[in-house]
Amino acid sequence: MDYFKTDLASLHADLVAKKISARELTQATFDNIKTTDAQVDAFLTLNEDAALKQATKIDEQGVATDQPLAGIPVALKDNIVTKGLKTTAASKMLANFNPVYDATVTEKLAQAQMITVGKTNLDEFAMGGSTENSAFKTTKNAWDYTKVPGGSSGGSAAAVASGQVLAALGSDTGGSIRQPAAFNGIVGLKPTYGRVSRWGLIAFGSSLDQIGPMTRSVKDNATMLSAIAGHDEHDLTSSTQPVPDFAADLTDATSVKGMRIGLPKEFLADGVADDVKQAILAAADTYRQLGATVDEVSLPHNKYGVAAYYIIGSSEASSNLQRFDGIRYGHRADDVKNLEDVYVKSRSEGFGDEVKRRIMLGTFSLSAGFYDAYFLKAAKVRTVIMNDFKAVLKDHDFIMGPVAPTPAFGIGDEIKDPITMYMNDVLTIPVNLAGLPGLSLPAGFSQGLPVGMQLIGRPFDESTLYKAGYAFEQNTDFHLQVPTLGGQH
């Protein structure tokens, strides 16, 4: 199965018409993964026996015409729990964790009759921007195996970009869907906070985390979002907002005509690579040619986003990860003398360096005497950043800009420099702080590596982002470019 030459709708039509069976498609998917993943290293766990049984059952029942995802394989980031299928969060702490329940999104995909083929690699507990922080392996960029795939959803991004699957789920706390999507030349959406249930997502930063789809095209992404979105009684932060058929509206390649688009001057400031700037300016020209107005706007407090995020996110992480103590959950150390020994040794052995760094930062920020100076101040900065977005989006349909300051960097180049790594998320983090939807899509190339564009919208207005993304896609060909797997540029 050549996933580079099809899309979800075409594949579903072939399944309904019995040009291919769900079992044949699933088997071909596993064959392809086994051929390519020795180089890409996108997957941590495969679900072959259960997936083939599910595919056979779908074939026996007949692929439903009103289920646009029925019979189609999907990959899940390995911090989304799957009943009976190992879920590790790429951490030694959870190396042998077999969940006894499904995440809500896992259930929703099963109800849509998608077939989960496996779990993808990530930075440990989703903390990182390169997937190098995984305890188990380093995933490669599909376009160049010497480059990182981004993170923390690098495994899902690489799986889609390398043609192993047509669709995958990731999670985004500070850019972890959008940045790897940009680095791999695919489409990734961080939905509005609350659009998708977090029940069954192994928590990092509970006020920031969102699960979202990663696909090869905007329309496929929209189809996936409709399947996983909606209120969930298990997640009280999930919204009761109605979930439209996002893909149904994607028919007009000129749908941005008359729209006002904001392009923040801060998004093209020093530190953003020239090729990235040129790609975004060219995209702005494309929108102008389609009848939109593109205005220079300002998000003056954007520069404080990274600092605020690493205080808030790390504080929430230090609280969420308390449960992994060697007694209730997670790895338990051997040769311990007392209760304190259990805690110290289990956590020291189970967590990697980046997770430890963030736990310590978060614990410090929440400690007596420092709470007001750090956490409370970061929360106030968050409000200011939200107000900046609100002011711009009051007069503009959406905001556009780059996803990351540079294309994918080399494996090993930044892993020993946490501050440099953190600054790669300077353009995505503010969107999480504000709880807004952000769509990443291919917008160009720099020395053979993909450059991503980010569209940022009003709360629960993913529809406008999809329309704008679709219009751009239909008037360019960046999303049609595919990697010569691992070819160095």
From Swiss-Prot:
**Is Methyltransferase found in the keyword set?**
no
What GO molecular-function term can you cite, just one?
glutaminyl-tRNA synthase (glutamine-hydrolyzing) activity
Q: What is its EC number?
A: 6.3.5.7
Q: What is this protein called?
A: Glutamyl-tRNA(Gln) amidotransferase subunit A
Q: State the SUPFAM superfamilies in the record.
A: Amidase signature (AS) enzymes
**Location of the active site:** K77 (charge relay system), S152 (charge relay system), S176 (acyl-ester intermediate)
Q: List the disulfide bonds.
A: none
Q: How does it assemble?
A: Heterotrimer of A, B and C subunits.
